[in-house]
């Protein structure tokens, strides 16, 4: 860009008249520096260019370097400057004050500011509100500010005003005396803890305020109390040796490296974990920090993860997400309240707290994974009054540097949100079925005890689709937060290593490290756990965490990578014997005076099923009480894994992992509405083992029976594709017998689907009284009280009928697709090439009728569920497999295709377009283009390169093969 064009550009923004320009400035330099960027480097360069163009004499060197570096920073960075930038500015000011005369360029800039009459002068506010400071947004300093009013946020100024520099000796002495009066003991090695001294060091203010601020002064008493609270929390369970602390502190040499480890807890930064001193990193507000400080009082159980938040100044984050393996047998390892940390000499607590470890150090998050033998000792500390859902207590220390506390509660709400007011149906496309009760998690006083890894995975799943402002502005925020939550989840889960935590092993654990000559101690395996029928909540939580990870990855473009997580979930579920019913509870002795018929007991505590767990084989037995809710969680988790195993066997062309034989005696999941209401006594009749009939509106009610039938078809297909025995099997009578049996199961499901529709539509339409009783009897706790109060009985009946018709449409579509899979070919290339002339056989005609029926059901689905939001995770593969025959007809017959087939093709295209909007996947976008191309040929729009079009379609479809060595959708 030439000088003339630059001058012309700057002149268009002039807020001044020519009469107000200072002498020696060009006509083009009428730009108020406040207009473009006050004190920006660009504006100074324009002044320099204009001065040279007019031949004005200037001081050699221009603006002094310190001043230039200080005024070249954006205003947001000035407002939230750190201590180094403050010192830099002070040096620049000193150097500028010692100059013999002011630079002409600075005088011109000052004159422009003084002569500005374009409007009110933009002033720096003394401090931003907590929300704007956290979101790195410009704040006007009002209460409430304009930004909080616009986005409906809570505007408050609760952050502590901090003072630059070191604390005075008087404050240090007061803090030390307060700590001594509090009874803080010295460390185990005899040295006084350095945390009490280092915690008094002052940290950089988040909003750059000076010592004397507009609305208040620095209060040493408040600062001393804050130092006391910080120092009190800094007394760790086991300290590292002094050499380790020296090594950690020695790694921080410059102001632009990591801060010292003695800092107060309020230096936790939230965003931009790539650099250590990023000025765009917001900070947590004081209420959030105080609530975290209250998590672990002195009398709390040290087993709880909530007490593991150290008071170091944490100015870093995840940089590479690497998790290295740590030797589990090390005796001397740094720990925080018995949490084993990596053996790094540089900031050992960093990986545990979601901070980035050094690139060369092992970053393994060695947290105690909940194991079958030790999770009963987990206890919740007293929760903060500001925490809406106390269930989040175990994960709060880990997510403090990632998301605000309020957003974590909102994400938990999103996880349990149902899009249907009549029947429970997860709104998130990544929640394929509810394993847990909503009320158990969201209970205000007695929530379910959960592992931190499970909670982190639930927040991660909800963050994928949440519309919270924290995740949508800027656009990169969601990806950054989700990446940190994913790394945290993996770190807390400790994949494939599920052993007892330090201090919670049995006395004979060390003796059982070697079992039958094989050393298994490093894998967390001991005789205490071998053969144990464990139902500990922590073990179930680990399996559910694997399910969350695998589901989201399966829905992405990295489908092949998801199998490692699904395999881990299936393997751990099999080890925990989730496919078996637990033994009944031992009878509990009745206390004296206790009535025989207690009608006030909690529904979830009725018929308590206590687990008898063998310990060490011959060492007797331990009786553990397992509630009916925990039993139902085990059942639902197994059946969810059972269904996804069969679903993914079709998606990825792989054999089954979980067998029907493993769950022959396992009860079917109870009704979702009764489950959420905790009415375990209402689930009287329960079927056992895999079933083939539709029983309800949920995934377990109508989709699980279809997956049972699909498992039979997958086994048949795998036998058919066997390289040695497949040809013999296809020509034997056993093949025909199995095909007839599977056809009978599909007919049974079709009949049960009709009965299900009649039961939930005709009976509801008979009368308002019966319908209202039916709706009220469903215990819809997932519907908000306002929604229940404002909706009428008639509208709820209509919603229930529509939901029932939608479920029937989905069930009908998948049933027709299973008929196609049973009779036809799975691979699209083999289907289009048709070497065996299957297109002229009777089985092709029967399969084509089912393909058209599936398309008609898809039209009903689009009517009742236009966005395909009911089950987008499962629906895609059945829509694809049901469309291959229609593509074959359009490709082979072209203009001779019947109108019903043309309508079916159009419906398939619309359904794929809706699926892409809800859950965008590459194979659906690809097949939509292929079907569009074939449909255009059917309608007579023949391209000139017809042969090339057909060849291109085959090349695209060749990516997804269901042959013997094909991997289906797993590219």
Curated annotation (Swiss-Prot):
Coiled-coil annotated spans: none
Region span, Disordered: 1-25, 55-123, 182-263, 295-316, 580-610
GO molecular function term, any single one: DNA-binding transcription factor activity, RNA polymerase II-specific
Low complexity bias spans: 9-18
Positions with biased composition (Polar residues): 67-96, 182-199, 227-241, 249-260
Induction: Expressed in presence of xylose.
GO biological process: DNA-templated transcription; positive regulation of cellulose catabolic process; positive regulation of DNA-templated transcription; positive regulation of xylan catabolic process; regulation of transcription by RNA polymerase II; xylan catabolic process
Stated role: Transcriptional activator of the xylanolytic system. Involved in the regulation of extracellular cellulolytic and xylanolytic genes and in the regulation of the intracellular activities of D-xylose catabolic genes in the pentose catabolic pathway (PCP) in response to the presence of D-xylose. Binds to the DNA sequence 5'-GGNTAAA-3'.
Protein name: Xylanolytic transcriptional activator xlnR
């Amino acid at each position: 860009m030439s000088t003339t064009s630059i001058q012309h550009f700057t002149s268009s923004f002039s807020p001044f008249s020519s009469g107000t320009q200072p002498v020696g400035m060009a006509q083009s330099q009428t730009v108020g520096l406040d207009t473009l960027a006050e004190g920006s480097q660009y504006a100074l360069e324009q002044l320099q260019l204009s001065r040279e163009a007019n031949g004005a004499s200037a001081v050699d060197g221009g603006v002094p370097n310190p001043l230039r570096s200080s005024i070249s920073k954006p205003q947001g960075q000035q407002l939230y400057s750190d201590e180094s930038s403050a010192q830099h500015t002070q040096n620049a000011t000193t150097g500028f004050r010692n100059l013999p005369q002011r630079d002409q360029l600075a005088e011109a800039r000052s004159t422009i500011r003084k002569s500005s009459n374009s409007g009110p002068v933009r002033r720096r506010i003394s401090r931003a509100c907590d929300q704007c400071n956290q979101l790195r947004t410009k704040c006007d300093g009002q209460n409430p500010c304009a930004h909080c009013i616009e986005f409906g946020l809570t505007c408050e100024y609760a952050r502590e005003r901090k003072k630059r520099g070191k604390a005075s000796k008087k404050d240090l002495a007061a803090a030390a005396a307060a700590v001594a009066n509090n009874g803080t003991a010295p460390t185990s090695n005899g040295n006084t803890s350095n945390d009490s001294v280092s915690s008094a060091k002052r940290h950089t203010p988040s909003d750059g305020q000076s010592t004397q601020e507009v609305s208040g002064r620095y209060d040493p008493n408040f600062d001393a109390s804050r130092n006391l609270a910080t120092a009190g929390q800094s007394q760790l369970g086991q300290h590292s040796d002094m050499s380790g602390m020296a090594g950690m502190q020695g790694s921080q040499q410059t102001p632009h490296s990591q801060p010292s480890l003695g800092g107060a807890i309020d230096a936790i930064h939230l965003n931009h974990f790539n650099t250590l001193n990023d000025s765009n990193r917001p900070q947590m507000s004081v209420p959030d920090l105080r609530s975290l400080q209250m998590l672990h009082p002195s009398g709390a159980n040290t087993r709880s993860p909530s007490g593991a938040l150290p008071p170091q100044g944490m100015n870093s984050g995840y940089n590479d997400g690497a998790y290295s393996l740590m030797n589990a047998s090390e005796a001397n390892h740094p720990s925080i309240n018995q949490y084993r940390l990596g053996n790094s000499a540089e900031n050992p607590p960093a990986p545990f707290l979601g901070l980035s470890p050094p690139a060369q150090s092992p970053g393994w998050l060695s947290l105690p994974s909940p194991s079958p033998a030790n999770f009963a000792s987990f206890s919740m500390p007293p929760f903060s009054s500001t925490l809406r859902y106390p269930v989040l207590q175990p994960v709060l220390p880990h997510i403090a540097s990632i998301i605000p506390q309020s957003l974590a509660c909102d994400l938990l709400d999103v996880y349990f949100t149902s899009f249907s007011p009549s029947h429970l149906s997860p709104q998130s496309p990544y929640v394929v079925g509810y394993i847990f009760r909503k009320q158990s998690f969201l209970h205000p006083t007695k929530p379910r005890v959960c592992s931190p890894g499970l909670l982190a995975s639930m927040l991660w799943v909800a963050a994928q689709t949440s519309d919270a402002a924290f995740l949508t502005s800027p656009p990169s925020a969601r990806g950054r937060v989700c990446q940190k939550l994913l790394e945290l989840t993996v770190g807390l889960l400790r994949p494939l290593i599920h052993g007892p935590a330090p201090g919670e092993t049995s006395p004979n654990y060390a003796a059982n490290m070697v079992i039958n000559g094989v050393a298994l101690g490093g894998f967390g395996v001991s005789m205490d756990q071998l053969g144990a029928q464990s139902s500990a909540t922590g073990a179930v939580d680990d399996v559910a965490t694997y399910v969350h990870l695998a589901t989201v990855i399966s829905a992405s473009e990295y489908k092949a990578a998801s199998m490692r997580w699904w395999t881990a979930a299936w393997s751990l579920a099999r080890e925990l014997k989730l496919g078996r019913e637990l033994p009944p509870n031992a009878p509990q002795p009745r206390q004296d005076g206790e009535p025989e018929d207690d009608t006030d007991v909690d529904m979830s505590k009725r018929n308590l099923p206590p687990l008898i767990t063998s310990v060490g084989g011959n060492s007797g037995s331990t009786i553990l009480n397992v509630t009916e809710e925990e039993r139902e969680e085990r059942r639902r988790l197994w059946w969810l894994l059972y269904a996804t195993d069969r679903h993914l066997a079709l998606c990825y062309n792989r054999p089954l992992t979980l067998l029907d034989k493993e769950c022959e005696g396992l009860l079917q999941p109870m009704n979702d509405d009764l489950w959420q209401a905790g009415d375990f006594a209402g689930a009287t009749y329960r079927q056992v083992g895999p079933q083939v009939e539709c029983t309800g509106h949920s995934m377990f009610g109508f989709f699980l029976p279809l997956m049972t039938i699909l498992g039979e078809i997958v086994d048949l297909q795998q036998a058919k594709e066997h390289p040695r025995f497949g040809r013999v099997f296809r020509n034997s009578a056993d093949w025909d017998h199995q095909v007839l049996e599977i056809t009978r199961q599909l007919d049974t499901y079709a009949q049960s689907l009709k009965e299900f529709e009649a039961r939930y539509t005709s009976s509801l339409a008979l009368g308002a009284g019966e319908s209202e009783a039916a709706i009220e009897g469903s215990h819809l706790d997932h519907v908000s009280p306002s929604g229940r109060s404002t909706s009428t009985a008639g509208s709820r009946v209509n919603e229930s009928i529509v939901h029932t018709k939608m479920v029937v449409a989905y069930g009908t579509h998948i049933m027709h697709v299973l008929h196609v899979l049973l009779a036809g070919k799975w691979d699209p290339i083999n289907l289009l090439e048709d070497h065996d002339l299957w297109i002229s056989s009777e089985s092709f005609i029967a399969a084509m009728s089912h393909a058209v029926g599936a398309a008609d059901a898809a039209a009903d689905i689009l009517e009742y569920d236009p966005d395909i939001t009911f089950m987008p995770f499962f629906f895609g593969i059945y829509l694809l497999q049901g469309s291959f025959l229609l593509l074959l007809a359009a490709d082979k017959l072209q203009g001779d295709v019947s109108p019903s087939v043309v309508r079916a093709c159009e419906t398939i295209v619309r359904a794929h377009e809706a699926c892409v909007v809800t859950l965008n996947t590459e194979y659906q976008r690809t097949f939509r283009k292929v079907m569009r191309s074939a449909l255009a040929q059917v309608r007579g729009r023949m391209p000139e390169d017809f042969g090339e079009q057909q060849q291109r379609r085959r090349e695209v479809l060749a990516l997804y093969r269901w042959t013997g060595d094909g991997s289906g959708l797993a590219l």
